[in-house]
A protein has these predicted regions:
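Small-residue (G/A/S/T)-rich helix-start motifs and N-terminal tracts that mark the onset
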Residues: 1-106, 115-128, 133, 138-266
């Protein structure tokens, strides 16, 4: 399935058939999250990237990636929350509105976006959550009203999945993917990935693959777990390529995604 999801574009493709992804990410405090995610998505091969955020961050995104389109618009997948703090009032309102209004888009919800997940969340069947352990524990405690400090690994991923109805990607040295079918343990990634911003890169890869393969997911030929697994594989391969040369920086990781795709396709 991963081979199918990572296929190269064909001569009949255009920028729209290659998928459109939207980002509501980054903030004045964490502007880099927007640059890392959009760069990773572009390097994954998505046809168009939209970005919604503060004016200062939007300017930084355009300076880094001039192909990005600013503002809301049609997209097959949305990345919500990476680098968005509680103080980002306008972005949080936009995230809440998009979650309420979206009917078919695939949602990848990360970091600050997880605050919008409640017991009444209704879009679990088309949503992937991407917490690290601390975020997963806080989310589970908020939803259950009980302490989850001692819940670990597969048990934690499964508990968050059951509480939300979403596909859950619990990030770590061995990333876990939880769905109604159970918990999948991904191959161990290089320890060098434990650095700021690499999760933003993973979200960008995952959203891009969701947009590129939207028709396969909508038609039942692929599941969100397949998208998540493929994204983790690309992320890990990019890290392996860089780790062979030394420490990893998140922007280098985002730019290495193209090379990782070539490696996996071969």
């Amino acid at each position: 399935m991963i081979d199918l999801l990572l296929q190269r574009p064909t001569s009949s493709d255009d920028k729209y058939s290659r998928g459109v992804i939207g980002f509501i990410t980054g903030s004045e405090e964490y502007a880099g999250a927007a640059i890392l995610g959009t760069t990773a998505a572009i390097r994954t091969g998505v046809g168009m990237v939209r970005y919604v955020g503060p004016r200062s961050v939007s300017q930084l995104v355009l300076e880094s990636r001039p192909e990005v389109v600013l503002g809301l618009g049609k997209a097959q997948a949305w990345i919500l929350g990476s680098g968005v703090s509680k103080q980002s009032i306008e972005q949080n309102a936009q995230i809440a509105q998009l979650i309420d209004d979206s009917k078919a888009e695939i949602l990848i919800i990360d970091a600050g976006g997880l605050e919008h997940i409640s017991t009444s969340f209704m879009a679990g069947a088309r949503t992937i959550l991407t917490p690290h352990r601390g975020e997963a524990v806080r989310l589970l405690e908020r939803l259950s009203g009980e302490s989850a400090a001692r819940v670990e690994g597969s048990e934690l991923a499964e508990a968050v999945q059951k509480a939300t109805g979403c596909t859950v990607v619990l990030k770590g040295s061995k990333t876990l993917i939880a769905s109604e079918a159970g918990v999948l343990e991904c191959a161990e990634a290089p320890a060098e990935l434990a650095t700021a911003g690499t999760g933003d890169v993973l979200a960008g890869i995952m959203g891009a693959l969701a947009a590129i393969n939207f028709d396969e997911v909508a038609g039942g030929k692929a599941q969100l777990t397949d998208i998540a697994e493929a994204a983790v594989s690309v992320h890990t391969r990019a890290a392996e390529i860089l780790a062979a040369k030394g420490p990893i920086a998140a922007l280098d990781l985002a730019n290495a995604v193209s090379q990782a795709l070539v490696s996996l396709r071969n």
